[in-house]
Design a protein with these regions (language model features):
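Single conserved hydrophobic/aromatic residue that forms the stacking wall/gate
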Residues: 1-13
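Short, intrinsically disordered, charge-biased short linear motifs at domain edges
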Residues: 15-16, 43
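Sec-dependent N-terminal signal peptides
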Residues: 17-24
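C-terminal motif of bacterial Sec signal peptides marking the signal peptidase cleavage site
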Residues: 27-29
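Short, low-hydrophobicity acidic/polar segments
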Residues: 32-200, 205, 233-244, 248-251, ...
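Contiguous ligand/interfacial binding patches
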Residues: 203-260, 272-278, 284-289
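Hydrophilic extracytoplasmic domains
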Residues: 278, 283-334
């Protein structure tokens, strides 16, 4: 579609200077970071990408799923919580084909010495995006999102934003670099058993969890989550096999969940214990997570459970870090 200055771009400079966008999905801990040079100096938008999930998103996954990007022209105003966002200057789906990225509805052109505000996310499906209407609310856009019911259906939602990008008069245009960040909380569970006993674990489940929420952009590559108000849901977790009395964390099996306060959250676990081929205990236990840290945007958490043989308390620890490392949480299992 023709997006030249004669087609409603307002004060866009008549020299058709292409907007080149670099989508550098620089996800913490990702070893695949690709830099792409703009293939030409024309007006066509080009994207660069690098990624890490449902297995963690990787570069091939991003090329397959693409991403959604919005841009707003705020003229002389810089982005803030009080700025009014007009009709999107760009509202497009970025797709990868023939070794390059293109955005639907393009090409797009730089306005001279005016501020463009960029907001992007991936995957494109499952997101309901809302920009402030400029009358009853202003400032940053937001979107609602619901995670899948199982780990296999959950995707590694990532977001990016760039504030106040400009093409100055008599200066060459530079790429707009979108640095994507993980927007969910990644959750894993590890179990330690008593040595010398055989444990058969039939159920591990996170309960009292909000499955949807609203993400509001705030600043560059930042934002806040508000958990949904719907009835809490449960998510089954699949443990890895025992090795040296401890379960392994299975690759690609992490839960990707909405960041939230753990007001009613619990881990439910059912297991039997055998000794020398004879069953000696059958347990159904719950571990409260209310005293552990809230789930934060872009964090990775590991809950480490110590399961007793019988009617003793289950120990638990928890740690939280950025996406590149996994912190254990060790709560007590009653």
């Amino acid at each position: 579609r023709d997006r030249s200055p004669s087609r409603g771009l307002g004060d866009v400079y008549k020299r058709q200077i292409l907007l080149a966008v670099t989508a550098a999905l620089a996800i913490t801990g990702c070893s695949q970071n690709e830099e792409f040079e703009a293939p030409s100096q024309k007006a066509e938008i080009n994207f660069n990408t690098a990624v890490t999930r449902a297995t963690e998103l990787d570069i091939d996954g991003l090329k397959s799923s693409g991403f959604q990007v919005y841009a707003y022209n705020t003229k002389a105003e810089e982005m803030s919580a009080t700025v009014t966002l007009s009709t999107p200057w760009i509202n497009g789906s970025a797709t990868y084909s023939d070794s390059k990225w293109t955005v639907s509805g393009g090409p797009y052109y730089w306005p001279l010495a005016e501020n463009l505000q960029f907001f992007a996310y991936s995957p494109k499906d499952g997101v309901t995006y809302t920009a402030p209407n400029g009358t009853t609310d202003k400032g940053y856009p937001k979107f609602t999102y619901t995670v899948g019911n199982t780990a296999a259906l959950q995707k590694d939602l990532v977001i990016a934003s760039v504030a106040n990008a400009q093409k100055k008069t008599n200066e060459a245009a530079t790429d707009v670099s979108l640095t994507f960040k993980h927007a969910l909380t990644q959750v894993n569970i590890e179990v330690t058993k008593e040595a010398g006993y055989t444990y058969t674990i039939s159920k591990v489940e996170l309960t009292g969890i909000k499955g949807s929420g609203t993400f509001t952009y705030a600043g560059v590559n930042a934002g806040t989550w508000t958990a949904g108000t719907e009835t809490s849901v449960s998510y089954a977790y699949e443990l890895g096999a025992f090795s040296d009395d401890k379960t392994a964390v299975k690759a690609g099996n992490a839960l990707m969940l909405i960041p939230q306060a753990l007001t009613d959250a619990k881990i439910s676990i059912e297991y039997t214990v055998e000794k020398d081929g004879s069953k000696i205990a059958e347990n159904s236990k719950e571990v409260s997570l209310t005293s552990t840290a809230a789930w934060a945007f872009g964090k990775k958490i590991l809950y480490k459970l110590t399961l007793p043989i019988g009617a003793q308390e289950v120990g638990i620890t928890a740690t939280v870090t950025g996406w590149d490392a996994e912190d254990p949480v060790t709560p007590t299992v009653d």
